[in-house]
Structure formats: C-alpha cells, structure tokens
Amino acid sequence: MICAISGSTTEEPVISTKTGNVYEKRLIEKYIDTNGKEPTTGEPLGLSDLITVKIGKTVKPRPTTATSIPSMLQLFQNEWDSLMLETFTLKQQHETVRQELAHSMYQYDAACRVIARLVKERDAARSALANARNIVQQQQQQTNNNNNNNNNKDVEMSSASTPSSSEDNLLDSTIYKRIAEKSEELIKTRKERTHQSLAEPDAIKQFKVSANVETDCQIKSLEVNSQDNNLIAMGGINGNVYVYSRETNELCTAIKGTSSAPINKVLFAPNNTIVSAGSDAVIRVVKGGESPSKKTYTQYKSTYQFAHKASVTDISLHVLGDYIISSSLDKSLNMYDIVNGTHLTSFGQSQQLCYTSVAFHPDGMFFAAGTQNGVVKIFDLKSKVNSFNFQGLSTAVNCISFSENGYYLTAADNNTVKLFDLRKAATKNSPDIQTITLDNQQIKSINFDYSSQYLGVASSNQINLYSCKSKQKPPISSIHSIDSDCLDFKWARPNSNFFVTSSSSKNIVNIFSN
C-alpha cells in the first residue's frame, strides 16, 4: 500500500472513510492535528474518520536497487539530486516573487507621490481662484472710486507721496536679489559673532539713572544710533524730533515742524538720515550733513514724505538700511525706498485689519505685523503671502521685537508678553513657548538687545529686565525690575551697556547705566 502523502510503502496503513485514500498513520495524524482537513480534497477530516488496515507480517524483500552498497549509493545520489533540483526551483520561484513584490511597492510609492502632487496642485488652484476673485473685486471697487473722483471737481493736493500700486504687485526682482544676498551673508556671519564686551546680568542689576534729558514735551519714541550709540533720536508728542548727544550731554538739535501730530516712531537710518512716522498719517525722511555731529544735525532738511490714509502706528528699518516697512490704521502695510523716495509695494490690504505694529526679521526676508485683534501676521517679502499667524494675545498688538539671532519673536498687548519660537512655526499652529503677564501694568514697549540675551519690557509704572537663554526652560527669566513710568524703551547696541527710557508723566528721558 502506497501512502498518498509520502508516496512510499506504508508501515501502518490507514484508510480515510471519506475519500478512501491510504495514508501512513503517523503522517496523517500529524496532518490532521495541524490542519484538520483531508490532504487531497481539503474536506474536514478527524481521527475518527480513519480506519486501520491490517496487513500480513511477512517480511518484505528488499528492492533490487538496494541489494548492494553501490546500488544504495546510486539511490542516495539520485534522491540528493532530486532534492537539489527542487531546492533550486524553489529559490527561483522565491526570487521571482520577491521581484514582483518590490515592483508592486515601487508602483504604490509612485502612485502616492502622484496623488500628493495632484492634491497640492488642487489646493494651489483653489487659492489662485480665491485670489483672482479678490483682485477682481478690488479692481471693480477701484474703478467705482475713480468714477466718483472724476465727478468731483475739487482736487486735494498733498506734498506726501501716496502709494498708487496695488497689493498684487510683487517686489522688484533686483531689490529682492539684494535682500536675499544680504540674508545669506548675515546667516553666515551670525554664527561667528561674539559678544565679548557684553554686560553681565550682575552688572545690569546695578543699572541706575546716570543721565537725564529734559525736553519741552513728552517723548513717545526713542532710538539709539547703532553706528554711534552716543546719539539718541527722540520723537515728541508735539510733532518734533530731537537728537541728543551723550558725549556732549546736550540736545544737538530739535527738528521742529516734522509733523503736525504726535510722533509714533522714530528711526536712525544710514547716511545721517532720520525717519519719523506720525499720527497725521505721514512718514517723513530728513537728512543732515555727511557726519552725525552737532553742526550737521542743525542742517537737517526734509527729503521725502510718504502718506497713508490713517495714522501710521509703526515703522521698521530693513537691515540693508535702504527700505522701511510701515503699519497703519488704514489697513495696509507699505514698503518704501527711503534713498530714492519711492513706494515699492503694499501688503495685507486684503486682510481688512488695522495694523498696530510692525518689525522686520533680522535676516530681512520677512516681517511681522501686529493687528488690532491680537494676531501677529508673518508676511514673506518675495511672495507677499501671509505665511503664518501667531495667536494668543487678547487685544491689539502694541509692540513687536525680534531677537537678533532670529530665533524668537516677542509680541505684547496691554498687559501680556508672548514669546514665540520661529523655529517651531512650521510644526505648530501657535508655537508660543512662554507667557509673561504683568498685572496692574500697561505695557508700552518691548525690546531685545543686540546679543539676544536680554529683553526689556517697559510698562506704565515699571521697567522689567529679563535674561533669555535658549537652553533653559522657560528661556526667559527675570533679573531685575526698576520702578519707573515709561512710554518707550531701547537698548544700546551692540554691547547693551546702557538703555534709555522716556517718561509718561514728565518731559524727560532717562539713561540707565552703571
């Protein structure tokens, strides 16, 4: 009797009652324990379905091929050859299956890539369609406004330059190339920058009023000249701009008639230039002599003027020194060339939000703008897209300050300061890593020093000084507080060896140092 599984003569034969097949008892029992099925037909089969077959006890003669040692060796050789051929065939089949599986995986990966690209193109098409609708609406509105203006016989004349280009005009490619090259240069040099003469925290704790400057009005905005920190620009609520020299301890000049309304922000620019922004919606650029001395400051003359339609709340100087960005309550952000006196482009008009503060990133590739609803918006200079929003403040964003190393952004409303990590902006909706709340205080100004290690927060009745270390958690820790009312606060650059504040109750500017 031949076993249906092994194909050899059985020693203990059994018969399946369901199929009549003969099996070796030990083999079929193992198969049933493992699979529970008939080997040839796949039908359910149990041990009770097997019947033992009784055979005679006569000794079976050996086959003729196994009667001698040479014959047995030949038999073993044939069996070995068959085994090797079967193994080789199995290896070939395994390799074929592996290649087919790899090919299927590559096809699956390619299909996923195609799907991702199509989804991206779909989203871009939707965004382009939405932008096109906004542009068409703006053009229709502008056409209606032009028709109304043509019907009006009175023409308003102004010496200030009002932007005429629409928001969809991109920044000139030549200008953007300069900005990109400067950004790459700054990224390389920033890693090599050291601050050997930087004031230590213990020294800053000892800061006190070392000098004060009396003026004929309250000073709303301050700026320390980064090229010569002996010079301090002051913007008054009477519309005048003052320049003070620490070296001579006197006012170099008072540039009167700069504005007819309070100066909201004043900046130093290269080539002995001062830029001021007022509540009268006008930005003024004035320039003196070739060197910043008392003699040349008295020779300041108005060079250019730029106009918004409502109060200019803030301005920021680009790291190149040739361009500024301005924020206004007329729901626009304008970029100007202060060297040639031209309006370059506008941002954020489609957002329909009043902008209360603005600041360029130290690398100069994008800027942040604070809004009246407590949101800080990031705009890319090249694409002009609002690429990210920082949230968490409840009222208008009064002031913004970037750390010079480019890692952090601080923004403040009336009594809360938020510290955001720009490196995590792509991974979180609002990557704020620390919140500072000043109860019973109204925050007026915040300012990072040049080393990015100190942060000053000035409020209506206190100056709060903090250290900032990226390796500690939280990164900002308080090091000192000074009881003093403030309207503005600025660190000296680059060594942070003093800072200046303006009083909210007196016509005075205080200089704090050791």
From Swiss-Prot:
Residues 137-166 have a biased composition (Low complexity). PANTHER family: PRE-MRNA-PROCESSING FACTOR 19 (PTHR43995:SF1). This is Pre-mRNA-processing factor 19. Keywords: DNA damage, DNA repair, mRNA processing, mRNA splicing, Nucleus, Repeat, Spliceosome, Transferase, Ubl conjugation pathway, WD repeat. Probable ubiquitin-protein ligase mainly involved in pre-mRNA splicing and DNA repair. Core component of the Prp19 complex/PRP19C/Nineteen complex/NTC which is part of the spliceosome and participates in its assembly, its remodeling and is required for its activity. Pathway: Protein modification; protein ubiquitination. GO terms for cellular component: cytoplasm; nucleoplasm; nucleus; Prp19 complex; spliceosomal complex; U2-type catalytic step 1 spliceosome. Residues 1-70 form the U-box domain. It is found in: Nucleus; Nucleus, Nucleoplasm. It comes from Dictyostelium discoideum (Social amoeba). Its main location: nucleus. GO terms for molecular function: ubiquitin protein ligase activity; ubiquitin-protein transferase activity. Homotetramer. Component of the NTC complex (or PRP19-associated complex) which is associated with the spliceosome. It comes from the Eukaryota.
